[in-house]
Curated annotation (Swiss-Prot):
UniProt-annotated stretches for the region Disordered: 314-372, 393-413, 596-651
Gene: gefX
A single cellular component GO annotation: cytoplasm
Domain Ras-GEF: 712-957
Domain named Protein kinase: residues: 21-274
Entry protein name: RasGEF domain-containing serine/threonine-protein kinase X
Amino acid sequence: MAEADPGLPTQAIWDIPFESLEFNEKIGKGSFGSVFRGCYLGLDVAIKKIEKADDPEYLKYIDREVSMLQSLRHPFIVNFSGICVHSSGLYIVTEFVSGGDVRQLLKKTPPIGWDKRVSIAVDLAKAMVFLHAKKIIHRDLKSKNILLDEFQRIRLCDFGFARMSEQTKKSRHMTMCGTEGWVAPEILLGMSYDTSCDVFSYGVVLAELITGRKPGVDLWVRSPETCFDINPEELKQKSIPGCPSELISVCVECCLYEPLTRPKFDEILSQLKVCQNNLKVATAAAAAAAAAAAAAAAVVSTPTIQTPIIQTPNISFSPNNSNNNNNNNNNISNISPDITTGIQQINLSSSGGSNNSSPSTPPQGSQLVSLAQSRRNTMSLHRKSMELNLVDGQLSTTPPPTSPIQSRPHKPSDSIWKIAAKPKHVGYQTLKRKQGPCYAALTSHITKMIERATSDYYYDTSYIQDFLLAYRCFAPPQQIFELLLSRYIANSPDNFTNDINGWKKVQRVIQLRVIIFFKRWIDYYPQDFLEEAMEDNLNEFDKISAQQNSSTALLLGTTISNNELLIDPKLMTELQKKRSELELLIQINSPSDFINNNNNNNNNPVNNINNINNNNSVNSSSSNNNNNNNNNNSNNNNNNNNNNNNNNNNNNGLNIINIAAANQSKMMLQNGNNRYSVLVTSNGIGNGEEPYPVSIIPPPTTSEYLDVKDIHSTELARQITIINSFYFNRIKAREFIEYIWEKCGEESTTTPYVGTSFVEVVPAENIHKFVRKCNNLARFVSTEILKQTKLQKRVATIERFIEAAEKCLANNDYAAVFSIVEPLVDQSIERLSDTWRNVSQRNLATFEHLKSIVSKENDHKKYRELLPDAKPPCIPNIHLLLDELSFIETSSPRLLPGGIVNFFHYRQLSRKILQSQQLQSHCFRPIPSIQKVLTKPPSELFDDELIKNNSLKCEPPVSL
């Protein structure tokens, strides 16, 4: 065997042996661990030791950071050297950057000049252009994560929160992360977000460079009352003298409230390059003017004569202007306003009063200011369309204030609620439910949520679904209706004052969004309109919308066509139509009633087939006997068919009985043992226009119930799935919220909904029924196995359940898989060694595969990997789903301090609920004789004590 080349590494390219690392002084500490200066292969490196290397939640972020750094190579991104796994911990090794970070640089005295500040902004924009081109969102952009080398060139680091932005509909993320003070408002409000959140954080970094202040402490202290919006006027007031106006404009653009109005990093970079060039020109002009002034002063020979007073360009700042000094405003007010124009000016004052100034600002700067102004003028109505105030408990609309400062009230710096008030770096990932004061949801925040749901430029259907599912937890229906009505009749905001036609076009889009919102509301949750005065409100809205449409037609009749006008929504008609549909569903019989009715009228499989197919019968007798019976009893068959039609009409809600009337051909297909009859339909269709599969009819039995071993495994799995599908599809989405309220809610609350209470209504009724059905199926499996006293019958029963579980897995009925396999791995059945020894090898191999799926290892990892790829219809494990929802409920608060709605919490619940509810029925034909076996009364099933005793009877323990 050839020897390995000694010049090649013997380990993986990114693996670093612990012995090769040299640790020096500790240079920092972050949310995931400590950072040391060290040495690797003679090079200075930074070594990050992970404190919680055994925590799977932390390791997820560490693995993400490592994978990101491995794939990134850029001059302004920290270079990754490798990773070291050792018994003492986990270590990430990167290049050592010796210049500290930008936050430390801004604290230095004397402060850095504007050329260096703009250079940092340009370099950071280049790095972000690179990241976004690779579809990477950093999500934790801040000055502490921007390192500086010895030449004060940046290195972007800390990719623990970074994510890939997939090019799909799911590209808008919802995970709440980032650092308080820099995080975008849409993240704080629990809304979906994309790469624009990095643009906002970048704008906050620019604000640090402009003011030298720390966000959330002495700059932009955001509060829930303003929905975490920022005040751009505060930036201009606190900016350091000499700041280029273009830089302020870029910063304000980046920090716009609406994500879609923020610029891309390509645009930001081009604007900053213009600003950088203008600054170089101004600096060169100022230096030339200063040199000329110095030469002129040297010519003057008489010192007693007043000489011109030379004021040098203010490129660097006085040491008295400390970055964190709270008296900066007083210092700034005493400086000439000419310094803040972005062009350094020199005033030469003499007795004659002559002045020489620097060249004027190039036209590119004014164009940028105009560009920023035009972008702000085209902002959506999300911010300014209406200001809703709660006066004496009544909701009223007021015109927007004229002063931009008054329109964004801010709390003082000593306020109880303050972004960045808590030192935790992990931020909103660590929010926990704690005992504390109860808050009422802030009306201004709910208003913002309504504006987002009815936005004229961005329409997010998932946001509307999540809002409608969860809003009852923080607002009554009447309040939501009033906010929607105010949104519908909103007056023209100040940025459309001179463009009434433009405003009317935007208003039509908003009104259309409001109408669509109402229709979705009626379609998804018509029961909400049973609340007091809600029907009257809908009638009133129909009248208002009709008047609005008439006014719009009169005002814009000459500029728009008739087909562009809004159609009267007639919401009350929509509600009545929906209620008519619900009244039909209320008449549905329960599945047990259906089965009992059929079983009372039919005591053999032949009649069961007649009840199902509304046609002729098929049984296991000879074809001649069948023909004779059909001819002699045609009248009876017709009567049976009529009865069956009535039964099916009464049970059409079961989604499993709606069989289309079609010509059906019958044939007898027998397996090797001549035991099963097979029904084949030529034109029969099931739900979704899919053909029903071939039904396998079990042989007749003289006893009350069929024996499980006599039922074909495929048909057994189908009948189990039919029952599970019926119970699961009856669960309403809000029942999950009711269930977790029952399990995790506070004792002081009588309902999870605001303004309502449960009166003669059982919360989460259908969930409890489905849970009981799954538990009864598990008891049924144990009962059917342990009631068999003979070994071969027990073996046949176990093999039948294993085969049925495999078929249920193919049907994506995970609830049935868990209900069947979990009893088989229980000690009472697993101990039956003689029985398991006779099970076939194929079934044993299948059973091992099923055990791996239901295994609790790594928090049901195998099951969680299969579930996202399952195509509907799919029935999840209800127990695990409820546990996940309960964990979300207890892991974060519903309301944040100040009354802000933690909509991220509700969106997590909603996404999990709606993704699990793939409300499609399986296309299987019911066999009542089999369903009768599967729906035995609970009193006929073994309890835990009987299961244990019968297990000992089947195979008594061997005494040693």
